[in-house]
């Protein structure tokens, strides 16, 4: 009987990975929502498993952001009566070189349906132990220092562990969201009599850190109990956490610096200016004339900072704050006003006397002016406000937002007889706030610049539905990268976007982000003869500006990779996105894409239309099996005053020539337009599972057909009897099915030129 159970287990092993996801309606692209454990040790080999995701079939390799971390796919037990080696797809043994610095890294999974989105992992020098999922609350596990424990929260269950109290209260660290986990951990600390000593909840990406009780126990305590659960009660494989007792001050899980929101790119590539230490500025003293940068800390006791500095004749300045971009839960406001220099001590005595004088007292005109100049220092009425800034300008998509709560403002040129005063507050700060707000302030001449962030286009641009996504570029197919930019420092020109380091057989159509636009898409195409490839690529954005001597200079910045770290959901709200360290691309060679749609005649082709004119756009489609349905093509990123509505690419049609009309008052320039094509594609999902089961059945049949085979013939006959119905059922499951999709495709350059002059 046990041998027959092993037969069923063997067949189930071949089927796993297909049937669990067979009902999904989206085009197959690998995405992972969790790896477990999310912490790796340099002290020993680490088991690591892809614990949650979509289209995770045949994950056979991991890519790490550091080459000193490597993974080997674990083998699976051989199938019954079979000697062909099997693979335990999605399960690995990971080795971390002891020379790898403790910190945060990224991992990508490579499988049948592309390469996944990155997931954050931490590397620690101590052993890592996994907490069991069924801890008896009456007999909790004891956790000790010098070990990193990892666990998951399951629905409303509470993970209970205990630790010793020695001559000091043990410091207890719990990290979760900095590891891309969906957990919002909550910690309740009790003594042995279940008296609550502290209750703590994570704030954003910050870890929980218990150091001393909020309520001191009445009796001596030898050990404390830690009750850990997910505040939102939605625990699952994606809701993991890490626990460390008495971590050293440099423990990587104590910091959130590695988890960078997309808008943190605004702080990158900026020239370093002289740093001013606020502690060296005397009370009511002046900062030097810009350019400079400084670091300020706001607290509930000191929630407002004021900085005053002189200005240069005719010089405008740019003032920018970086706080939320550094992981702070802040919302900074800056108010800039012009103010007369502070009076001397002798003048201040005269001013105070004049202000205390009875109403109607005649004053010397010079003294009256000094009183007038002094009042804005002690009251808000009458201030010469020149700038107010809160949130930065918005950009990005609803999936990966490039909008920052950090303000940026322009201080216009003004008279040197007055200083500029900056009043800085955090609108999120409360009188009982526990956490200080740290910020970097830069003030200096405007530097023309732009920053760019991209992300692989998810299957939806609806923020309520956006979820993690990887990338899969099939032979003869296409995939898309959304690119968002923010201009600053007076730069307002066009930005050219392209990609470098592409493999043979893969090309990209360069794009233009015109003045006034902030978005475009890069469309990647693979030829039919492209070969399998996995590697890093480098998208870049370029523009031109003038230097201080009015000479033309090229600006070039890498397009930073953005990724959805947490999918949108009803209980956790909009998707959460962060920056990634690199771009990974995978070319799939197992199949050819059902359709490829292009516009024009090559990547450098331009459709030129004069103002008030029209033109025909040649659309060409290469259709293959599964790509014969009609497509509704909707143009994206159209400039104003250009008429170009959606149109149909009829079933099986290989060409279309829609008309574009340009109004006489449109803005001349060069633009990139692409299409979002709504189409139903037919594909077989993971046909390899069927082929493997057939091959296994055939190997067993071959053994039975061999008269010299001395194996267990009754078991072999049983295997065949149980396998044949599975093969028939699986043949139906892998039959091509409909995948409704929105395909980004057919980019082209539209050049709008002035109308030709009428003949005289």
Where do the model's predicted regions map?
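Ser/Thr/Pro-rich low-complexity tracts
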Residues: 13, 25-156, 160-167, 186, ...
């Amino acid at each position: 009987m046990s041998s027959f159970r092993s037969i069923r287990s063997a067949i189930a092993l071949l089927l796993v990975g297909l049937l669990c996801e067979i009902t999904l309606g989206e085009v197959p692209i690998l995405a992972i929502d969790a790896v477990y454990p999310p912490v790796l040790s340099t002290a020993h080999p680490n088991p690591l498993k892809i614990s949650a995701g979509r289209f995770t079939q045949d994950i056979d390799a991991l890519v790490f952001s550091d080459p000193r971390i490597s993974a080997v796919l674990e083998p699976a037990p051989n199938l019954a009566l079979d000697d062909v080696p099997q693979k335990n797809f999605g399960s690995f043994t990971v080795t971390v070189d002891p020379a790898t610095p403790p910190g945060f890294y990224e991992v990508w999974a490579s499988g049948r349906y592309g390469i996944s989105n990155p997931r954050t992992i931490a590397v620690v020098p101590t052993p890592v132990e996994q907490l069991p999922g069924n801890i008896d609350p009456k007999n909790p596990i004891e956790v000790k220092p010098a070990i990193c424990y990892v666990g998951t929260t399951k629905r409303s269950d509470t993970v209970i562990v205990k630790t010793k109290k020695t001559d000091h209260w043990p410091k207890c660290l719990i990290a979760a969201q900095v590891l891309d986990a969906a957990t919002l951990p909550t910690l309740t600390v009790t003594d042995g009599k279940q008296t609550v000593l502290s209750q703590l909840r994570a704030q954003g990406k910050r870890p929980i850190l218990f150091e001393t009780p909020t309520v001191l126990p009445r009796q001596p305590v030898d050990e404390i109990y830690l009750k850990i659960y997910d505040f939102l009660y939605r625990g699952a494989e994606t809701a993991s956490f890490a626990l460390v007792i008495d971590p050293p001050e440099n423990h990587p899980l104590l910091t959130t610096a590695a988890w960078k929101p997309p808008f943190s790119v605004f702080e990158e590539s900026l020239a370093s200016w002289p740093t001013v230490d606020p502690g060296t500025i005397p009370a009511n003293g002046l900062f030097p004339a810009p350019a400079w940068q400084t670091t300020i800390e706001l607290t509930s006791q000191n929630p407002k900072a004021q900085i005053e500095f002189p200005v240069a004749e005719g010089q405008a300045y740019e003032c920018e704050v970086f706080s939320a971009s550094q992981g702070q839960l802040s919302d900074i406001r800056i108010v800039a006003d012009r103010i007369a220099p502070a009076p001397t001590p002798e003048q201040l005595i005269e001013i105070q006397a004049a202000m205390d004088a009875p109403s109607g007292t005649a004053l010397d005109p010079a003294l009256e002016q000094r009183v007038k100049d002094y009042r804005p220092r002690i009251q808000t009425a009458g201030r010469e406000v020149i700038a107010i800034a809160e949130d930065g300008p918005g950009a990005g998509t609803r999936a990966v937002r490039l909008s920052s709560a950090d303000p940026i403002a322009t201080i216009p040129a003004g008279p040197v007889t007055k200083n500029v005063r900056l009043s800085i507050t955090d609108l999120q700060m409360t009188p009982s706030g526990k956490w200080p707000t740290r910020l970097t302030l830069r003030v200096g001449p405007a530097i023309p610049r732009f920053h760019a962030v991209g992300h692989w286009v998810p299957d939806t641009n609806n923020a309520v539905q956006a979820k993690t996504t990887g990338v899969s570029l099939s032979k003869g197919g296409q995939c898309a990268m959304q690119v968002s930019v923010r201009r600053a420092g007076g730069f307002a020109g066009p930005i050219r976007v392209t990609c470098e380091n592409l493999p043979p057989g893969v090309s990209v159509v360069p794009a233009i982000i015109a003045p006034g636009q902030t978005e475009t898409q890069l469309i990647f195409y693979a030829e039919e003869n492209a070969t399998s490839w996995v590697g890093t690529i480098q998208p870049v954005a370029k523009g031109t500006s003038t230097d201080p001597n009015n000479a033309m200079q090229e600006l070039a910045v890498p397009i930073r990779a953005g990724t959805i770290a947490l999918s949108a959901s009803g209980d956790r709200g909009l998707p959460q996105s962060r920056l990634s360290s690199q771009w990974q691309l995978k070319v799939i060679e197992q199949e050819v894409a059902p359709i490829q749609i292009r516009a024009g005649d090559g990547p450098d082709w331009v459709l030129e239309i004069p103002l008030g004119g029209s033109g025909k756009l040649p659309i060409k489609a290469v259709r293959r099996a599964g790509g014969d349905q009609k497509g509704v093509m909707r143009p994206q990123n159209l400039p104003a005053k250009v008429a170009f509505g959606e149109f149909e690419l009829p079933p099986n049609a290989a060409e279309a020539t829609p008309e574009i009309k340009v109004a006489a008052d449109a803005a001349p320039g060069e633009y990139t337009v692409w299409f979002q094509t709504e189409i139903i594609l037919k594909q077989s999902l993971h046909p390899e599972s069927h082929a493997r089961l057939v091959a296994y059945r055939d190997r067993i049949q071959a053994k039975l057909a061999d008269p010299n085979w001395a194996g267990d013939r009754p078991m072999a006959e049983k295997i065949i009897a149980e396998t044949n119905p599975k093969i028939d059922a699986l043949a139906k499951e892998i039959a091509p099915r409909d995948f409704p999709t929105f395909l980004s495709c057919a980019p082209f350059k539209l050049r709008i030129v002035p109308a030709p002059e009428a003949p005289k």
